[in-house]
Each structure stands twice: as structure tokens, then as C-alpha cells.
From Swiss-Prot:
PANTHER family: PYRIMIDINE/PURINE NUCLEOSIDE PHOSPHORYLASE, PYRIMIDINE_PURINE NUCLEOSIDE PHOSPHORYLASE. Pfam families: Ppnp. This is Pyrimidine/purine nucleoside phosphorylase. GO terms for cellular component: cytosol. Keywords: Glycosyltransferase, Transferase. HAMAP family: Nucleos_phosphorylase_PpnP. Catalyzes the phosphorolysis of diverse nucleosides, yielding D-ribose 1-phosphate and the respective free bases. Can use uridine, adenosine, guanosine, cytidine, thymidine, inosine and xanthosine as substrates. Also catalyzes the reverse reactions. GO terms for molecular function: guanosine phosphorylase activity; purine-nucleoside phosphorylase activity; thymidine phosphorylase activity; uridine phosphorylase activity. It is an enzyme of class 2 (transferase).
Amino acid sequence: MSLLEQVSVSKKANIYFDGRVASRSVFFADGSKQTLGVVQPGEYEFSTSQGEIMEVISGRFEVLLPETTTWQEFSEGTQFELAANVSFKIRNTAIAEYCCSYL
């Protein structure tokens, strides 16, 4: 199991898509932030306001990255990077978890 140490965690979850996606913000002493999220089965579109690295913690996602037409699969232990101010889609058939690091 991977641990995040010496952090502060937001008590209130970020809830999206009528509760089908939920995440918690994690704050580090150096001022950086990550979010840890759980995604119920479905298809969702997200937008970024800053660069992100999305790491799949459990399960798998199919991802339609910006400016692409082919879905790519990312499973536990893999990651993908997103630029600022882009939109992307994810879909999954079972509950999956992610960790988002902001660039």
C-alpha cells in the first residue's frame, strides 16, 4: 500500500456527476496538492485548469485524451499527463481510483 505522509486532508469531498465521482484534496507541507478520487462506473468529461498527472490507483480507465480519437486503456499503476486548459473523457465499467498530482 502506498502512503502519503505528513499531509493535511480536506474533510469535505469534492462531489461530481451526482455523486458518481468523489475526491478529497491532500495538502503537503511544501504547498503542493493532490487529489485522491473514486469513480463509479460510467463515462465522464473533465476539464483541467492546470497541468495534471493522473495515476490509476486501482481498477482501470479508458481515456480519450485531448485531440485524439482513440480511447486508451490505463490500469492500476499507470498514469497519463494532461496540459492546462484541456478537456478529456474517462470511462470505466467497475469502480476505479486515481491520484491526481498538479503541475
